[in-house]
Regions:
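N-terminal non-catalytic cap/leader segment that marks the start of a structured domain
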Residues: 1-64, 90
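Active-site environment of non-heme Fe oxygenases that use a 2-His-1-carboxylate facial triad
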Residues: 35-39, 46-52, 61-284
């Protein structure tokens, strides 16, 4: 325990643990600035489940390390749950689901509402906010630069999709490790009105196979089972800091409930941006 009293102080500890703080660029989650380059871990309601994922697995580069820090924690619940990605991958590599993720890759989906149409598709963000403009041609240019497919909805909203490989080559182990952001699957909204009334493809974000086929109930159960075998909960106390090698450890957050007067304030900062190496051969 560091004894820090505010998560904004996390940046003071980066040199101590030997990492270089970077801006959180390219992330698709909604976050609040907590000071010192530290962001909130997310804005998802406490009663929803955040599935296991490596940070920014959907992007063309990712942070080599991520640091979590705790300022305030509830008496019970609110843990961050981590899992050894090497062990999870080993459990998946001989399954049909693991093979499909490796062979087909992943398609990420983002849906944005139109700030000028309050009667359109509901989402957690507008395309004006996401792309920081009000000009559709600028959105087209940004998507083209990123290699994203852009569709303008009839209500003025935007649907963005892009493909990425499901595994990443890890130089340290010489192995391919699962690198799919399961937390971006549309089931994240199953208990989150009004988004749970939408089809998965219309929810704020979703994940399918790269060919557009959906992960089946069996696929999701296979992934859940693999992760559940190797989970380790981090029971937070104020002043705690945890540093994870991003490709080596997934993180997730089960639902929790705050009692009257309780708060959960966890910060995140990212470091050492690393370009994707992607899959090197045909074997998992």
């Amino acid at each position: 325990n560091t004894g820090m009293t505010a998560v904004a102080q996390m940046s003071d500890w980066t040199q101590t643990v030997g990492i270089q703080q970077m801006d959180y660029e390219g992330g698709t989650g909604s976050r609040f600035d907590l000071g010192g380059g530290v962001l909130s871990v997310g804005t998802e309601p406490a009663h929803t489940n955040i599935d296991p994922h490596c940070e920014m697995a959907y992007w063309h580069y990712y942070p080599q390390y991520i640091m979590f820090g705790c300022e305030v924690a509830p008496r019970t619940g609110g843990e961050t749950v981590i899992a050894s990605n090497e062990r999870v991958t080993a459990a998946l590599k001989d399954t049909v689901t693991g093979r499909k993720l490796f062979d087909r890759g992943i398609r990420y989906v983002r849906n944005f509402s139109d700030a000028s149409n309050s009667d359109g598709l509901v989402s957690t963000s507008t395309w004006q906010n996401e792309f920081k403009c009000n000009d559709w041609t600028v959105v087209e240019e940004q998507c083209d630069q990123r290699g994203w497919q852009l569709e303008r909805r009839a209500d003025g909203g935007a649907k963005v999709t892009w493909q990425e490989q499901g595994f990443e080559y890890d130089e340290k182990t010489g192995k391919h490790l699962l690198f799919t952001s399961l937390a971006r699957h549309g089931r994240a909204f199953d208990e989150w009105p009004p988004y749970n009334a939408l089809d998965h493809e219309d929810r704020p974000y979703h994940v399918s196979y790269a060919d557009g086929s959906q992960l089946s109930t069996t696929d999701l159960s296979t992934l859940d089972e693999a992760f559940s075998q190797f989970t380790i909960p981090i029971h937070w106390r104020p002043g705690d800091i945890a540093v994870l090698e991003n490709i080596a450890w997934t993180h997730s957050r089960p639902p929790y409930q705050l009692q009257r007067g309780e708060e959960r304030k966890i910060g995140i900062l990212v470091s050492n941006h690393k370009p994707r190496l992607r899959q090197r051969d045909l074997s998992v």
